[in-house]
């Protein structure tokens, strides 16, 4: 039996587990680049974010391990040039958001998600548990750079694509976000 993992990070963990006697191969997950590509939209206009630097977070289910509360902290730290947009929140989570975070439940299609990635200036993925992490790959395909935490598979994916990896600390995220040179104050 050969074990297949979606990242070297998970392969290394597997080799340290009770499964270590089995060979392990890495096969990266892929995305559909006919969908995840630069996709023009009216997203900025629809949400009144024309002159903002959009800091995007995307998750299927938002919880602490996905970095939701790091976005709450970032909302207190970033000035009004920035707009945090989170996709994938529940209705309750949206109701509980700080006023300076825009929450979106789900997208209606992968194409809509690609348009949001394209509209964003940077994707932030502060997850502390990822076996691969599709969002940085999808964002990159749409022309949007990513900032991810180290010590997860996201680090491996981000480094291969020239993105930014920071220690698992909200202050490091803040420094990376504010250190980016955005064209035109938020319009890519």
Identify the residue ranges that each predicted region occupies.
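Nucleotide-activated donor-binding/catalytic signature segment of Leloir-type glycosyltransferases, i.e.
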Residues: 88-111
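Short hydrophobic beta-strand element within catalytic cores of glycosyltransferases
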Residues: 145-148
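Aromatic "clamp/platform" in nucleotide-sugar-dependent glycosyltransferases that forms part
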Residues: 128
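Conserved donor-binding/catalytic core segment of Leloir-type glycosyltransferases
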Residues: 48-66, 72-76
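Carbohydrate-associated surface elements
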Residues: 9, 30
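Short alpha-helical donor nucleotide-sugar binding micro-motif in glycosyltransferases
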Residues: 115-120
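Conserved acidic donor-binding segment of nucleotide-sugar-dependent glycosyltransferases
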Residues: 163-170, 178-184
């Amino acid at each position: 039996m050969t074990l297949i993992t979606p990242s070297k990070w998970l392969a290394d963990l597997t080799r340290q587990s009770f499964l270590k006697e089995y060979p392990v191969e890495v096969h990266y997950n892929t995305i559909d680049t006919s969908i995840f590509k630069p996709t023009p939209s009216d997203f900025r206009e629809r949400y009144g974010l024309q002159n903002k630097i959009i800091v995007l977070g995307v998750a299927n289910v938002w919880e602490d391990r996905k970095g939701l509360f790091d976005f709450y902290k970032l909302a207190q730290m970033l000035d009004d040039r920035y707009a945090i947009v989170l996709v994938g929140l529940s209705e309750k989570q949206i109701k509980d958001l700080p006023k300076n975070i825009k929450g979106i439940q789900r997208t209606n299609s992968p194409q809509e998600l690609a348009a949001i990635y394209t509209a964003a200036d940077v994707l932030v993925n502060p997850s502390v548990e990822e076996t691969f992490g599709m969002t940085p790959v999808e964002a990159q395909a749409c022309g949007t750079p990513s900032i991810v935490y180290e010590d997860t598979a996201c680090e491996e994916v981000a480094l291969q694509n020239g993105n930014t990896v920071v220690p698992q600390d909200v202050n490091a995220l803040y420094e990376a976000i504010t250190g980016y040179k955005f064209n035109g104050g938020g319009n890519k």
